[in-house]
């Protein structure tokens, strides 16, 4: 076999190179959706890190969905649902799953079938365990949580594209767990459109270049004050905007 032609990527998921680097790191290419997996506990989830993943997906114009695994550690899906309601209200499909108890797997299997997905998220949240539970033939290696730092150990050390069984087919890329996630090539003034729940309000700000901080007649701040937009997500926007402006 020989490579005859390299076709352009139709999509990509890119982040800043780790370790404070300034380069671009391609996580996956030619995918249809990004599936961001976090644990309900063990390791403790950090919402701002989840927001970073979602902003990167939005900036790369990729559909995203959220999976909260290990819900058995917090009393089940009903107990976990309220903590993550902000993401459902923002328009993201949210899957509450337990690979251990095989809960919530059918809906996630349906979301993965027939498309090319990339699973990403921190180490130790159960990405490989989820894939093994949904598609037993994959037989992926799984790891444990370090008791000393409450963080996952890497068990997936490279990105792998797995064909999915079944009539609908599809592929899933299982990527190594990430302990840091940096945004790449995103202008600070473009951040607000990467928060779907802010988009309806952006045309109604008095100033076209509104930063949604202290400007008068800011429709975004008015929506937050009225409870129409999550205060936690808005605070995350402000934090991430500050980081982008410092880069």
Question: Could you say what each language-model-derived stretch is?
Answer:
Residues 2, 22-33, 42-62:
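Switch/coupling subdomain of P-loop NTPase systems
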Residues 119, 132-136, 142:
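Conserved ATP-binding TGD loop and adjacent catalytic N/P-domain core of P-type ATPases
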């Amino acid at each position: 076999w020989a490579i005859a032609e390299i076709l352009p990527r139709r999509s990509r998921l890119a982040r800043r190179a780790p370790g404070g680097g300034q380069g671009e790191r391609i996580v996956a290419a030619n995918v249809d959706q990004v599936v961001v997996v976090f644990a309900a506990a063990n390791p403790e989830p950090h919402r701002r890190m989840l927001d970073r993943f979602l902003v990167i997906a939005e900036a790369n114009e990729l559909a995203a969905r959220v999976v909260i695994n290990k819900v058995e550690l917090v009393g089940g899906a009903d107990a976990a649902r309220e903590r993550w309601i902000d993401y459902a209200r923002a328009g993201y499909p949210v899957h509450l799953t337990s690979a251990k108890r095989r809960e919530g797997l059918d809906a996630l299997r349906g979301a993965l079938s027939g498309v090319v997905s990339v699973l990403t998220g921190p180490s130790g949240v159960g990405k490989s365990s989820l894939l093994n539970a949904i598609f037993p033939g994959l037989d992926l290696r799984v790891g444990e949580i370090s008791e000393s730092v409450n963080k996952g150990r890497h068990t997936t050390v490279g990105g792998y594209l797995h064909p999915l069984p079944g009539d609908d087919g599809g592929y899933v890329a299982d990527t190594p767990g990430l302990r840091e996630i940096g945004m790449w090539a995103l202008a600070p003034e473009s951040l607000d459109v990467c928060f779907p729940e802010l988009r309806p309000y952006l045309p109604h700000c008095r100033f076209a270049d509104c930063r949604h901080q202290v400007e008068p007649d800011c429709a975004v701040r008015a929506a937050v004050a009225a409870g129409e937009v999550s205060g936690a997500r808005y605070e995350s926007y402000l934090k991430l905007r500050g980081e982008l402006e410092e880069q």
